[in-house]
Regions:
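C-terminal alpha-helix
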Residues: 232, 236-243
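Catalytic nucleophile-loop/oxyanion-hole region of alpha/beta-hydrolase
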Residues: 48-73
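Short alpha-helix in the alpha/beta-hydrolase fold that links the catalytic acid
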Residues: 184-194
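Short, surface-exposed "cap/lid" segments of acyl-processing enzymes
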Residues: 2-48
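The alpha/beta-hydrolase serine catalytic core
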Residues: 109-170, 177-183, 202-234
């Protein structure tokens, strides 16, 4: 399925991946939008590019992310942001009133996570070098395993966001699988809808999905949908991005 657009006036679509995702994770979705006439690019999250150690904590990571966003200062763009990438984008918009996306699609945004208080306590105890198993499917992983310090950048970002969260800064489509293993889908829906009048967080249900731990967190890839459901998912994205 492709929608017809006038490519001469289309904003760019900028993608933001999640924690421990590689640059190929959005491949099919980016190709789909390019075939529809959009120009696409991806923002690489802190510690996921050439320098894995460029940020030691959430504050460092947000500084690095803000530097990456400078290249979009004069760009008209839509954002499609997944998980940790969605968190970075919201934190950046809270502090940077500059060139925000025209619209944003948030896929399983890591703004509220399951067992959050327990995880926060664990992160305070664990040395930063302790290895933590990645829930990202192997095909989408940047690294085979994470450190507690790298995972804590996500956790502390979530804590910060929850302290300062307000209304979403731009028109938003938010989608989440209610069985998401990382994001607390029900809390996400309740909190965002409470803060944003008229917003409906959409549940994407896939009862047939049996690809192991972490599979319900993946919303961006056709291998995690039956064909008709993937087509419906794409249609929702296109309908929201109509210009």
């Amino acid at each position: 399925m492709t929608d017809s657009y006038n490519s001469s006036r289309l904003p760019k679509i900028v993608f933001f991946h999640g924690l421990n995702n590689n640059t190929g994770c959005f491949g099919p979705l980016m190709s789909h939008f390019r075939e529809s006439g959009f120009e696409t690019e991806m923002v690489i999250l802190p510690c996921h590019g050439e320098n894995r150690k460029e940020a030691k904590n959430s504050k460092d990571a947000l500084r690095v992310f803000a530097q990456s966003m400078k290249r979009l200062e004069k760009t008209s763009y839509f954002a499609i942001a997944f998980s940790h990438g969605a968190l970075y984008l919201q934190l950046w918009m809270e502090k940077n009133p500059g060139n925000k996306p025209l619209k944003q699609i948030l896929l399983a945004p890591a703004l509220f996570i399951r067992k959050q208080k327990l995880i926060e306590k664990a992160m305070k105890i664990l040395p930063s070098f302790v290895l933590v198993k990645s829930l990202a499917p192997k095909a989408f992983r940047r690294y085979e395993i994470l450190t507690a310090g790298e995972y804590n950048i996500l956790v502390q970002g979530i804590v910060t966001y929850q302290k300062i969260m307000n209304q979403l800064k731009v028109p938003s489509l938010v989608m989440i699988d209610p069985k998401d293993e990382l994001v607390h889908a029900q809390n996400l829906k309740a909190k965002l809808e409470e803060k944003n009048k008229g917003l409906e967080v959409q549940f994407i249900e896939r009862p047939y999905l049996k690809k192991g731990i972490g599979c319900h967190h993946i919303l961006f890839h056709p291998d995690y949908y039956e064909k008709q459901d993937w087509e419906e998912f794409l249609q929702k994205l296109h309908s929201f991005l109509k210009v």
